[in-house]
Curated annotation (Swiss-Prot):
Subunit details: In cyanobacteria the RNAP catalytic core is composed of 2 alpha, 1 beta, 1 beta', 1 gamma and 1 omega subunit. When a sigma factor is associated with the core the holoenzyme is formed, which can initiate transcription.
GO cellular component: DNA-directed RNA polymerase complex
One GO MF term attached to the UniProt entry: DNA-directed RNA polymerase activity
Native organism taxonomy: Bacteria, Bacillati, Cyanobacteriota, Cyanophyceae, Synechococcales
Protein name: DNA-directed RNA polymerase subunit gamma
Cofactors (names): Mg(2+); Zn(2+)
Organism: Synechococcus sp. (strain WH7803)
Amino acid sequence: MTNSNLRTENHFDYVKITLASPDRVMEWGQRTLPNGQVVGEVTKPETINYRTLKPEMDGLFCEKIFGPSKDWECHCGKYKRVRHRGIVCERCGVEVTESRVRRHRMGFIKLAAPVSHVWYLKGIPSYVAILLDMPLRDVEQIVYFNCYVVLDPGDHKDLKYKQLLTEDEWLEIEDEIYAEDSEIENEPVVGIGAEALKQLLEDLTLDEVAEQLREEIAGSKGQKRAKLIKRLRVIDNFIATNARPEWMVLDVIPVIPPDLRPMVQLDGGRFATSDLNDLYRRVINRNNRLARLQEILAPEIIVRNEKRMLQEAVDALIDNGRRGRTVVGANNRPLKSLSDIIEGKQGRFRQNLLGKRVDYSGRSVIVVGPKLKMHQCGLPKEMAIELFQPFVIHRLIRQNIVNNIKAAKKLIQRADDEVMQVLQEVIDGHPIMLNRAPTLHRLGIQAFEPKLVDGRAIQLHPLVCPAFNADFDGDQMAVHVPLAIEAQTEARMLMLASNNILSPATGEPIITPSQDMVLGAYYLTALQPDVQPVDFGDRSRTFSDLEDVIHAFEDKRLGLHDWVWVRFNGEVEDDDEREEPVSSETLSDGTRFEQWTYRRDRFDDDGALISRYILTTVGRVVMNHTIIDAVAAT
């Protein structure tokens, strides 16, 4: 015995969207109750009773079809409580179960006349027109009851299969057929509306048509060949998916679950409802009226007009505004159809399925973080404490700072120093991923080591901006925390910003300094024309090492473009092309001084270098010192 309420995991390889047959649509909505009654068909346009505020039976919110609106309670109230689980009430026919079944149980409307599916008729390209090899204008004339189409020419010599006839032309032919001297034995058959379209589609034998098209393609070229290939491709797709062309004409339309098109009561006693309910109501009203007209054998012109109105109602339900006048509600606002709910940026796919919010993620504005290393980013403490909360709670309990989760959460809310210390321990070595939409290539999401910062903005290293196509004029970025050890390892090994220096598209470096970085490097190393070099020996401008120069600059004893003499024993490259020094002096102890334009060297009597002072600017010392520190750090 299996419990139907248990969640079962179904593993599948892919989801395929294909045409649904009328039988499949009936299967979605039809259920057989234990007493043998078959439910699922929505026959009434009513939604809820205005006095009892309960759903109307066989209406758009029917509890018998879609399930109870209250957990474990039938419509009439005979059965209440969970102990009656699975029982179907004998009085009202409602199954006693959870109300959440109203989110997935469907119904259906059996149409009194077939209607064309507007996606396949008015889509680009029009699959109905391609399959029938007819102009779209002609197909529309048939569907919307403007022209007859010849389904069988019979013995009439002037008629051809699929030929269009106006009302007057058909009346003339009818007079001719039924004349006393008529020689036509096999009468021609014509049709109009979606019924005629369905007949034409049923007459198609896809395999034979595909074979015939392949033969025609072999002997044709140019525009005709392209048209034949287009038609063959559509037919091959129908064959591959085991779909029949006549399924593009609907005999049954599904009614989506009521909790996906809710009706809620507002404060003033009025109701707010989904637009779909209004669109379904129009379809049901027109369908019921058509069925009644057919029962009483109403004149053909009235029935035909009702069929056209039913076609327009179903068109509006599926895709409002695609053809004809847009159906509007209160305040002349167009009603949202099924297509509007699915498509676009705010549609179900892009808004709720592809772009859904996930746990362990955050979002904030980015600002420049020039003091960061390239593999680091500044993460606001407020965000970090929220993103890493489970890790912090675990560590607080493990270190016996608190005894339970509730106490840990209270401590975190107070943001004590020990919490911040634990947070720092947690984020050390735990990479986070930053993503900037739109993620157009793989470098649109990269991993960084977080550094806790004050404020509410994420700090980003300026060098990684080209990869994200980011700038600091209000751009926002999303933060994601990889949880599993495998995910953290992958993020560190493959996605760390410092490991993604080359563009995957071109192979050229994408980490290139630009804008203020280039300007800053230029300003730091530029020579000011109005600042004169100093002579060697000026004690205020002579320093024993690079650190002393930087200290003097930080103490504001020197400006960024001031000239200084600084001792430096490394290799020096300069633009001095002289072969001989400016001056040379040998002392009594054998040591020798050589004065060049930008350096002063001292050699012993064997010619070995004892010391070297170079003439440079404070900015160049800062630049050199920064590069040396960066290289040493790696």
